[in-house]
């Protein structure tokens, strides 16, 4: 594991946490799916020594092991004084599951029609600064469209992406932050091997000692 990657990720989290306090007057939110990437982000946030909260979007289709892991992980974090929140999906003002959503949409989600992401996976954090475990190595699309820092306006065409902490567009980015959710992807430049190496070196027991992924 390249320790420079760890330090860069920690610096990004500290920058995001500071910006969150300045612009939103609230702690940074670290989102977690219960998977390997977001679990690394939680561990890095703890190591960074920042003030943060943790949020999980309950998709209704997670494996039981993931649900059990989230419960145990949230118990561990709450015992350390870290606020944790679970968001349950709503559609048209009503609680939904994947199975109740499909009849309303008249089709299951597909690679091209991925309504499940916006309703089940990406809700919450409006008007706040959040982190995700998104990485460029996951797909060509993410390599082309995602960055270290992002704004998430309702119109995707107005999205601003920064890949340099000193980017000339930072002033525009910060202006847009006042109106929209902002995102930091601290491990965006990590490879799959980097993630697994970090888990093995830093949080193996915490993740795998009866907790699952």
Protein language model annotation of sequence segments:
Residues 1-213:
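Nucleotide-activated chemistry modules centered on ATP-dependent adenylation/adenylyltransferase
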